[in-house]
Amino acid sequence: VRSRRQRQMCIRDRPDTLRYPASLTKVMTLYITFDALNKGIIKMNDDLKVSRHAANMAPSRLGLRPGQKIKVKTCIEALIVKSANDCASVLAENLGYTEANFAKTMTKVAHELGMKNTTFKNANGLPNKAQKTTARDMALLAAAMYHHFPQYYKLFSLKKFTYNGKTIYTHNNILKTFAGADGMKTGFTNAAGYNIITSAPVSYTHLTLPTTPYV
């Protein structure tokens, strides 16, 4: 558990044990996307092209088709609410030319943020034995997201969004059941188990809980 105000760990249990990040990977994909938005490299209403590679991603996905176009804003909402693997790959390919190249940037940025035990191999968190992180590193990423991109951080509290006339609801049940919870991301693969980064104001501070995995 990390205090946002004090910027330090206040409770810990095996914070440096290597784990598979599963869909917590998407928080870094979004971090780099928000950085690109801040720098004017992309805009929320820009159209992104969907490749066959992205369209063929395993679930969870939005159901994109090769050759179609999708807005940056929709991709972001789909990552946060539905944890859409196809949308993560779309962002990666449009920002990094290939997903593998984007993953190298993800790892580089992670190390710059002090996430020394993290390696990314894809943008969505689908199984890869070389893709690893720790609870401590995920706490650092969550803090960096809040402090560097406060204007976008509120998106992590989205409970639903609309795509093609259909309302899609969040996987993050803590947003529905814990008063004050304001994000961030859940994840699951068979190899990783269930994991989560969540945050909420408590008394005079704001606590972030990254757990990899939780049961």
Q: What are the residue ranges of the model-derived segments?
A:
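Positively charged, low-complexity/disordered segments
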Residues: 3-7, 208-215
